[in-house]
A protein has these predicted regions:
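Class I SAM-dependent methyltransferase Rossmann-like catalytic core
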Residues: 1-21
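Class I SAM-dependent methyltransferase SAM/SAH-binding core
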Residues: 14, 18-68
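A short acidic, Gly/Pro-enriched loop at the edge of an enzyme's catalytic core
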Residues: 66-78
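A short SAM/SAH-binding and catalytic strip from SAM-dependent methyltransferases
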Residues: 76-91
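A short glycine-rich, Lys/Arg-flanked "PGG" loop and its adjoining helix->strand segment in the class I
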Residues: 91-106
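Conserved class I S-adenosyl-L-methionine
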Residues: 106-134
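Short alpha-helix
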Residues: 124, 134-157
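A C-terminal cap/extension of S-adenosyl-L-methionine-dependent methyltransferases
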Residues: 159-183
Length: 183
């Protein structure tokens, strides 16, 4: 993993850990970035954690995220990890999440802001070789509109990733004040 990727992962863990540590229940499901599920969900207090990913791995489900083989009103927590921006059917995904979540369940959406430096990098992706996510980035306002249509209540919006998409660890350390100053 690149220095930038490691930095973003640590920032994400810092934001997710308090949320996951206060979420209780029987079932959680992470959709997207299956390789990071174990690390990101370490603080999760939900009893059974599943990930949409490789079917040959323990606790991984292989399915279409817009047609999950999960009972309605049965999941306490869903984490959409960079998935809305990498699907052609974001509305269908959100409808399916709404279907499987219990009435007081939590949905955590993790994605890049199209108006950020990462979003600008996405805009120039045709000239860049190693862009990690090549989908369509949606604004927080657009996602909030979709959520309201489905009946979700948004409690919190956190932003991370104020650093530019750079690879030099020394430059990342020197610019870390951007991340702290924007909170």
């Amino acid at each position: 993993m690149s220095a930038t990727g490691q930095y973003l992962l640590e920032e994400l863990e810092g934001r997710l850990s308090p949320i996951l540590a206060t979420t209780f229940g029987y079932y959680s499901l992470q959709v997207g970035c299956a390789g990071l599920a174990d690390r990101l969900q370490q603080a999760c207090r939900v009893k059974h954690q599943f990930t949409l990913g490789e079917a040959d791995q323990e606790n991984h489900i292989q399915a279409n995220p817009s047609m999950l083989p999960v009972a309605s009103d049965s999941v306490d927590l869903v984490i959409l990890m960079h998935h809305l921006s990498n699907t052609s059917e974001p509305h269908a995904i959100l409808r399916e999440v709404f279907r499987i979540l219990i009435p007081e369940g939590k949905l955590v959406i993790i994605d890049f802001n199209p108006k950020s430096l990462w979003g600008l990098r996405h805009f120039f992706q045709s000239w860049l070789e190693h862009v990690p996510f090549k989908g369509h980035f949606y604004t927080a306002k657009r996602i909030d509109d979709w959520m309201r249509l489905l009946g979700f209540d948004q409690n919190r919006l956190y932003r991370i990733g104020y650093l530019p998409p750079i690879q030099k660890p020394s430059l990342i350390r020197h610019l870390s004040w951007l991340e702290k100053g924007m909170r």
